[in-house]
């Protein structure tokens, strides 16, 4: 059940593999895009959003070959009207859930890469670091062994808030969807 009208639109548009391929080809940095075989992208049925957060988020999971290895592209849609400091923590939780599922399938296998992507449509421009480690108190002064204890990952953020300046590009269906979520942030 989709709790928010934006969820249905998100899942219909980006749930269509051709639109997801177009989004990745249009928005990912070229050095990342060249590692992904977009022709191998397949939608997965899983969602990892907790029930109490479904009002604020929707997600899609895709399987793809990245550097000739099975991997995932995880897209999180952020419905909140403001930047959320905890998105990195939530992504880490969802990525762990994806890896847990993989471990249950085959225990001794190495875990697949997960490429985390956040689409933001809030009222204000995104103002939170996309580096997970920046969420840790005192990280900027840590060195050596302490710094090694911090999980390090970065998510790709696409800010479609009304004042972000993010250019809307791509095929018609994708542009229409992105313009619509941008306009929804104005209300």
Where are the model-predicted features located?
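Conserved single-residue anchors adjacent to enzymatic active/cofactor-binding motifs
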Residues: 1-187
């Amino acid at each position: 059940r989709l709790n928010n009208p934006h969820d249905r639109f998100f899942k219909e548009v980006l749930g269509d593999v051709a639109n997801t391929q177009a989004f990745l080809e249009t928005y990912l940095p070229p050095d990342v895009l060249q590692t992904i075989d977009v022709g191998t992208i397949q939608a997965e049925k899983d969602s990892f959003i907790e029930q109490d957060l479904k009002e604020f988020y929707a997600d899609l999971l895709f399987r793809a070959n990245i550097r000739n290895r099975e991997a995932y592209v995880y897209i999180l849609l952020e419905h909140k009207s403001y930047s959320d400091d905890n998105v990195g923590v939530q992504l880490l939780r969802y990525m762990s859930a994806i890896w847990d599922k993989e471990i249950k399938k085959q225990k001794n296998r190495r875990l697949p890469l997960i490429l985390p992507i956040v689409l933001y449509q809030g009222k204000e421009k995104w103002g939170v670091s996309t580096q997970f480690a920046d969420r840790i108190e005192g990280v900027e002064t840590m060195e050596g062994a302490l710094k090694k204890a911090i999980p390090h990952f970065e998510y790709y953020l696409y800010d479609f808030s009304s004042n972000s300046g993010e250019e809307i590009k791509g095929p018609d269906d994708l542009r229409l969807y992105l313009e619509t979520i941008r306009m929804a942030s104005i209300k």
